[in-house]
């Protein structure tokens, strides 16, 4: 169906102002009163409708990624990977797919300065011929916790104190002291990359491992990596304070203005590929979202390019109501066993139904651009006009049938029902390797962030000692530097 045929009239359809019901409005300034100074009458229908509509203009903000900006464009395949996947939108070089991309900060609220230290969201919706594929990632390749049972607590710890509504690092460091696997993400969070100069100059990662499946049914694990063609640029703390004090929407403005003048942002997409049979070769679990895949062993393969060449037409309709879901995949792609990814498949759809409504997938920005059909019907704010008599399947009166089968990974799984920690935690090695890859001045900025936040008077000696231990296990000299500036001895 074409949603535009059934949408309410807009101001452009009539030469004069009307109510929602189409009735003419001849005075949009003065309320209906008893005399010039009398009480306002409830029978002023236009006034009541106008106020009631205004009261309901806003929807609940996202629990995470509330502050964001969107843009449209296309993804173009530049390198043949048809031997790895049967996904139609990746079928051959030159194939283009329309996309919408949303950049965001993770923790901070809608309207907060875009210059604050935070992980940035990098979410891409591909409108393919086989349905939507949502690659919902960030500008860092890892996350704080590997199991979704800790996710609500993770976000609560990062968000403001519920009593004062102030973000406080004593809460953050207290909670994550129980999650040693979080140190690797802090090696990104306290690094320069979490102060990107804008959205155009930051990398993007799919974060989770997915699977690519070819026509023969052979599956490979895959990780996605976006690299900006204009390079990665970050701010110092001082620059971030200055930029945020000048314009709290600097990154949104930069993105919008760049596209408006034809300076289109572009990213190259590359992938890591891993044969499932090689998973046990590593000293870490490759499906652990707190780990990266080493490029020297699993080099990046080029796939395509992402170009953003159109600004959105309506911020509310195409940014606030834009909804992503890691569960949206297409034939030739599949999920991995990553515990956090598995639970995001449920959580994202659930939060969109709460935030936007049960029929959020009918909104033009979320609906697939290919032909689609199912028997999901009615519900609050349904605006799809349907006149068929058969709303079930199968039926001899309706030609709708099952789609042709496509390959999905098939493995024999066995094990006991249990709640357990993965075998290869290896919580500190990659954090240390990242620290040692930096120049001394970058290392010093990282150490300074730890010293700053561990110096909070509400951070106890026990919490400081735990973090010094974690840092020392990642890199002995890093732990010593932080400890010496805190007048604490590192413990192993």
From Swiss-Prot:
Primary location recorded for the protein, binned into one broad class: other
Oxidoreductase listed as a keyword: yes
EC number of this enzyme: 1.11.1.6
Active-site feature positions: 65, 138
Entries under Pfam families matching the protein: Catalase, Catalase-rel
Compartments in which it is found: Peroxisome
Catalytic activity: 2 H2O2 = O2 + 2 H2O
Alphabetic keyword roster: Heme, Hydrogen peroxide, Iron, Metal-binding, Oxidoreductase, Peroxidase, Peroxisome
InterPro entries in the record: Catalase, Catalase_AS, Catalase_clade1/3, Catalase_core, Catalase_haem_BS, Catalase_immune_responsive, Catalase_sf
Chain positions recorded as heme binding sites: 348
Record GO terms (molecular function): catalase activity; heme binding; metal ion binding
Highest taxon above the source species: Eukaryota
Induction: By 3-aminotriazole.
Transmembrane segments: none
Keyword Metal-binding: yes
GO cellular component: peroxisome; plasma membrane
Cofactor(s) essential for the protein: heme
GO annotation terms (biological process): hydrogen peroxide catabolic process; response to hydrogen peroxide
Family membership: Belongs to the catalase family.
Subunit and partners: Homotetramer.
Role of this protein: Occurs in almost all aerobically respiring organisms and serves to protect cells from the toxic effects of hydrogen peroxide.
Protein name: Catalase isozyme 2
Organism: Nicotiana plumbaginifolia (Leadwort-leaved tobacco)
Taxonomic placement: Eukaryota, Viridiplantae, Streptophyta, Embryophyta, Tracheophyta
Gene behind this protein: CAT2
């Amino acid at each position: 169906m074409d949603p535009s045929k059934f949408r309410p009239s807009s101001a452009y359809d009539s030469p004069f102002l009307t109510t929602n019901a189409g009735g003419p409005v001849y005075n949009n300034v003065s309320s209906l009163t008893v005399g010039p100074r009398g009480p306002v009458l409830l029978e002023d229908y236009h006034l009541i409708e106008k106020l009631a509509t205004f009261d309901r203009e806003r929807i609940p903000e996202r629990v995470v990624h509330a502050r964001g900006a969107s843009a449209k464009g296309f993804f173009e395949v530049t390198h043949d990977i048809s031997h790895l996947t049967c996904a139609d939108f990746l079928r051959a070089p030159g194939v283009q797919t329309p996309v919408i991309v949303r950049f965001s900060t993770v923790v901070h609220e809608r309207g907060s300065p875009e210059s604050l230290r935070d992980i940035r969201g990098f979410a891409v919706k591909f409108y393919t011929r086989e349905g939507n594929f949502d690659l919902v990632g960030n500008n860092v390749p890892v996350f704080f916790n590997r199991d979704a049972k800790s996710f609500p607590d993770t976000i609560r710890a990062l968000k403001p104190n519920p009593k004062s509504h102030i973000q406080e690092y004593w809460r953050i460091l207290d909670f994550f002291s129980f999650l040693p696997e979080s140190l690797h993400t802090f090696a990104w969070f306290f690094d320069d990359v979490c102060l990107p100069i804008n959205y155009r100059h930051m990398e993007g990662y799919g974060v989770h491992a997915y699977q690519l499946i070819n026509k023969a049914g052979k599956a490979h694990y895959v990780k996605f990596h976006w690299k900006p063609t204009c390079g990665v640029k970050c701010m110092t703390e001082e620059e971030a304070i200055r930029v945020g004090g000048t314009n709290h929407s600097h990154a949104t403005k930069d993105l919008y203005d760049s596209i408006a003048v034809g300076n289109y942002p572009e990213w190259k997409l590359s992938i890591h590929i891993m044969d499932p049979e090689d998973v046990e070769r590593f000293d870490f679990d490759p499906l652990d979202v707190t780990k990266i895949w080493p490029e020297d062993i699993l080099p990046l393969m080029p796939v395509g390019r992402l170009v953003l060449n159109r600004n959105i037409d309506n911020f509310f309709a195409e940014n606030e109501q834009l909804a992503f879901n890691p569960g949206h995949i297409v034939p030739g792609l599949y999920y991995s066993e990553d515990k956090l990814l598995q639970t995001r498949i449920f959580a994202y759809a659930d939060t969109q139904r709460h935030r936007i409504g049960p029929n959020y997938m009918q909104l033009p920005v979320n609906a697939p651009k290919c032909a689609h059909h199912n028997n999901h019907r009615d519900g609050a704010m349904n605006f799809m006009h349907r006149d068929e008599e058969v709303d079930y399947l199968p039926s001899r009166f309706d030609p709708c049938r099952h789609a042709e089968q496509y390959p999905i990974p098939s493995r024999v799984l066995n094990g006991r029902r249990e709640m357990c920690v993965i075998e290869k935690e290896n919580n500190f090695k990659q954090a240390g390797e990242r620290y040692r890859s930096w120049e001394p001045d970058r290392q010093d900025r990282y150490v300074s962030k730890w010293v700053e936040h561990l110096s909070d008077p509400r951070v106890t000696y026990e919490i400081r000692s735990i973090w010094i231990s974690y840092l020392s296990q990642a890199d002995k000299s890093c732990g010593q530097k932080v400890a010496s500036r805190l007048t604490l001895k590192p413990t192993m």
